[in-house]
A protein has these predicted regions:
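Short, flexible, surface-exposed loop segments at domain boundaries
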Residues: 2-3, 31-76, 82-416
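Sec-dependent bacterial lipoprotein signal peptides
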Residues: 1-35
Length: 416
């Protein structure tokens, strides 16, 4: 409706049309999402469509890409990550990776940035106990969760993945890994530790990636504890703020991790720039005080008069946030716990051939995720046993996070 039409109809009528305008936009966005090839079928249970702006969290599924159970069509998105030399492209996304989605249209991703926290050799590998295993990677503590630790989602463990080459021993001391997750304070270690959402074998490199929570402001800072690794910053981030998440690349592998010099450092916390749109931030709550919560080094103020339930330390949440007048972030709505955040539910949808569907009993990869062989009764219940080899099949699998290949809880097939 143009300005002339508004004047003809009068100012009182135009507000009445706004709900219809919003409904039309929502229908158009839903149609675009369904028709552009990023997703298949209806939204699976508990999954909503993401909005525009920024969303940061953990990949919980595919078909399009699910970030803390919010769906974004990634079929035309630019996939990228940061490296020691700057931004580089990425071929694919993986379950359990931490990512940052930027979108200018609701539910449609313009870019997806992979946010790894550690890359380098394992120095220590403890035995699993009580559903938890501890690693020390590039001097930092990593907590691996198994399905026995029911209070949080299990870690996706890509033990013998595509990069193991001729050395496919289990992940342990000396093996290079890439780790994703959330930084939380651990009272037992008296340090911030990386609660891992994904640990995968990686190829050795001439640069290691180290990250953590800065303990003080400065150009040289310690991370994760008062006696943690000291990093001399360089590159994009010359000075860090206290309690900020930083990521830094270190040339080669130092003999000790007490003090290192970065070739490049960047801010890991979510920045609230002057033009920041509302954002969604998911992860484990690291800190709660009277007027704020902290997730991965990002402080989120709790507005005065907030009537909702305050998140608890260690709880995994998804928070809708907005920029404050002071330049930070504040809660915009009551935080929610993404469905399956405590149980580690993974949802994967993909289009495969009928011949591939016939091999579900032996196992296969869907969207780059290895799925173990599916039991015959589950295949029959999901309509996956009587599919023509030449048919196009939309398959949907629900599984549990954990070591690859993932074990399917349920599967459904629909032939076109």
């Amino acid at each position: 409706m143009n300005a002339v039409s508004q004047r003809v109809l009068g100012r009182d009528l135009f507000p009445l049309l706004r709900p219809l305008h919003r409904l039309a936009n929502a229908l158009l966005a839903a149609f675009a999402l369904a028709s552009c090839g990023g997703g298949v079928g209806e939204l699976v249970s508990g999954v909503g469509s993401g909005g525009s702006g920024i969303a940061e969290g953990t990949i919980t599924g595919f078909g399009s890409v699910l970030v803390d159970d919010l769906r974004y069509d990634d079929s035309r998105a630019r996939l990228k990550r940061q490296s020691a030399t700057g931004e580089t492209s990425v071929d694919s996304l993986k379950i359990g990776q931490r990512v940052r989605v930027v979108s200018t249209q609701a539910g449609i991703a313009d870019s997806v940035e992979v946010l790894a926290d550690l890359l380098g050799p394992v120095q220590e590998a403890g035995a699993a106990a009580g559903g938890v295993q501890w690693l020390r990677v590039v001097g930092q503590w990593v907590r691996i969760e198994s399905s026995a630790a029911a209070e949080v989602a299990p870690t996706v463990l890509d033990d013998n993945g595509d990069n193991c080459g001729n050395d496919c021993r289990p992940i342990g001391v000396g093996v290079w890994v890439e780790v994703h997750g959330d930084w939380v304070f651990d009272s037992g270690k008296q340090a911030h530790v990386l609660r891992a959402s994904r640990v995968e074998r990686a190829s050795p490199s001439d640069q290691v990636l180290i990250s953590g929570i800065a303990q003080q402001r400065g150009a040289t800072v310690r991370i994760n504890s008062a006696s943690g690794t000291e990093i001399k910053l360089a590159g994009d981030l010359a000075t860090a703020e206290a309690n900020q998440l930083i990521r830094a690349w270190i040339p080669a592998e130092p003999a000790v991790w007490a003090s290192v010099s970065a070739s490049r450092a960047i801010r890991g916390s979510l920045a609230a720039s002057p033009g920041s749109a509302p954002a969604v931030l998911g992860g484990a709550v690291d800190e709660v005080d009277g007027d704020a919560v902290v997730i991965n080094g990002t402080r989120i103020a709790i507005p005065k008069g907030f009537a909702g339930t305050r998140p608890e330390r260690g709880q995994t949440i998804r928070a809708e946030i907005e920029k404050t007048s002071e330049g930070g972030w504040q809660l915009k709505a009551q935080p929610s716990a993404p469905e399956g955040s405590s149980r580690g539910v993974v949802k994967i949808e993909s289009e495969i051939s009928g011949s591939e569907a016939s091999r579900l009993s032996a196992g296969l990869k869907l969207r780059g995720t290895a799925i173990a062989g599916v039991a015959a009764d589950k295949l029959a219940a999901g309509g996956c046993t009587a599919v023509a080899a030449s048919a196009k099949v939309k398959v949907s699998i629900t599984a549990r996070r954990g070591p690859l290949p993932l074990q399917a809880d349920s599967v459904s097939c629909r032939a076109d």
